[in-house]
Amino acid sequence: MSNPIYNKHIISISDLSRSELELIVSTANDLKQNPRPDLLKNKVVASCFFEASTRTRLSFETAVQRLGGSVIGFPDSGNTSLGKKGETLADSVQVISSYCDAFFMRHNQEGAARLASEFSSAPVINGGDGSNQHPTQTLLDLFSIYETQGTLEKLQVAFVGDLKYGRTVHSLTQALSLFDCEFHFIAPAALSMPDYIIDELKAKGCKYTLHDHLDGVLPNLDILYMTRVQKERFDETEYQHLKSSFILNANMLEGVKENLKVLHPLPRIDEITTDVDSTPYAYYFQQAKNGVYARQALLALVLTNEFGDK
């Protein structure tokens, strides 16, 4: 069985080909339908969070345990040698990776996961590095899109809110650009999509439009991807100005396509009002649950040869 992801570092979504993304999505679907509680028996996975996380850490550790593996690590680097004694990231990674079969990490500095992969003896999986990349979030997003739309091809996708610092939208845009999707980027000028993402879309010939409001965009969409303005990346005055730039409520969803699904990487603050939760379009809580299956799929492929092309 051919598995091109076996023992591979997963640092950026751009490290994965279209066929590899499809393999991960199909494996996630397989594991959701057919649990494999002993697949990672005797495997040890390090879960090392140098930056705070709730959903990513818990869903990843749940994924390991539901596949029969064991987890070591820490939820906060404050009490580690790196945090307390000034140990370098490179030294920490070399030591920790010698204890495990895979190394899952989140860090607040861009490029930290790539650096870790140069010193790790185990495959590194990036759980988010600063405002740069968040590939495992992208995998659960792709799985959720496939699950609700039946395809990843030629969809109309809008990203709303913080497109500058929101690493989830960077990774997902790069992934969906492989599937001939059309993009709508809806953000204030201060939070617009980075130039390097726009340049990549131009190079691939992907269609995209820029908007400064939601009006007129919603009726054509298959996927509406909302994001929060990340308070931790702004001073208080700027945050208060930007946080309510784009708010979605249930009334705005009148006249949208029946297959539309609203996604959000969570946590939400006030950018999606709670009356949206009870509509048939809300899918963000199911999306979060899919994080377990997407991360199970990635672990299964990185650590075993049980899945792949026959």
UniProtKB/Swiss-Prot annotation:
Family affiliation: Belongs to the aspartate/ornithine carbamoyltransferase superfamily. ATCase family.
Pathway noted in the entry: Pyrimidine metabolism; UMP biosynthesis via de novo pathway; (S)-dihydroorotate from bicarbonate: step 2/3
Record function comment: Catalyzes the condensation of carbamoyl phosphate and aspartate to form carbamoyl aspartate and inorganic phosphate, the committed step in the de novo pyrimidine nucleotide biosynthesis pathway.
Positions bound to carbamoyl phosphate: 55-56, 106, 134, 137, 266-267
Keywords: Pyrimidine biosynthesis, Transferase
Annotated L-aspartate binding sites: 85, 167, 228
GO BP term, pick one: amino acid metabolic process
Annotated protein name in UniProt: Aspartate carbamoyltransferase catalytic subunit 3
Known partners and oligomeric status: Heterododecamer (2C3:3R2) of six catalytic PyrB chains organized as two trimers (C3), and six regulatory PyrI chains organized as three dimers (R2).
Keyword Transferase belongs to the record: yes
Enzyme Commission no: 2.1.3.2
HAMAP family linked to this entry: Asp_carb_tr
A cellular component annotation (GO) from this entry: cytosol
Catalysed reactions listed for this entry: carbamoyl phosphate + L-aspartate = N-carbamoyl-L-aspartate + phosphate + H(+)
InterPro entries assigned to the protein according to its UniProt record, in alphabetical order: Asp/Orn_carbamoyltranf_P-bd, Asp/Orn_carbamoylTrfase, Asp/Orn_carbamoylTrfase_sf, Asp_carbamoyltransf, Asp_carbamoyltransf_Asp/Orn-bd
Pfam families, alphabetized: OTCace, OTCace_N
Species, as recorded: Shewanella halifaxensis (strain HAW-EB4)
Example of a GO MF term: aspartate carbamoyltransferase activity
Domain of life: Bacteria
